[in-house]
Amino acid sequence: LEALEKINCNVKKEFKSISPKLGTLEEYLLAVFDLFISKGKACKRSGFSLTLLAMETSELSPLIAEKCSDILENWRLLLADGLYDRNLPEDLCNPISEWLFTSIQGAISANRIHKDEAFLYNIKSTIKIISLASPEFLREIFTKGNEEEIVA
């Protein structure tokens, strides 16, 4: 657990350091994505694999799986804060951060399993779509007809 907390502190520090430096939404999202990719390379793996660690340990060590899950949720909340800091409407920050964070985790996991960079390039396309879309279009995608958030 101590090693997980060390990773968490390191990533949170780097996560927060990107926020004030990059102004546009696209630059910010690409920097966040690059942070996860670079952490994977630093761990000598093809992707930052806290998600896979949580999956692999869920039955053997629920405590480790829960810690991984808590760390990932904390990082997702940092992403939501970063979206808000870039003037994304507040009602869109959580659903978009949930969708994007889940997509990033999936792409990194798929890249690691299949050893195929295409999964990582899909995230860059997703970032471009989020960056170029109007708030109205994003609301259409990320909210239900009765204005409730879609749960990712």
Name each model feature, range by range.
Residues 9-12, 27-31, 42-45, 61-85, ...:
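Amphipathic alpha-helical packing segments from all-alpha helical-bundle domains
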Residues 3, 7, 11, 15, ...:
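Hydrophobic recognition helices of helix-based DNA-binding modules
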Residues 2, 31, 35, 52, ...:
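Alpha-helical elements of Rossmann-like donor-binding domains used by nucleotide-donor carbohydrate transfer enzymes
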Residues 62-72, 85-130, 134-146:
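Hydrophobic/aromatic-rich alpha-helical bundle segments in the mid-to-C-terminal region
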Residues 18, 36-41, 49-59, 82:
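Helix-loop "lid/cap" segments that line or gate small-molecule binding pockets
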Residues 11, 46-50, 103:
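N-terminal alpha-helical segment
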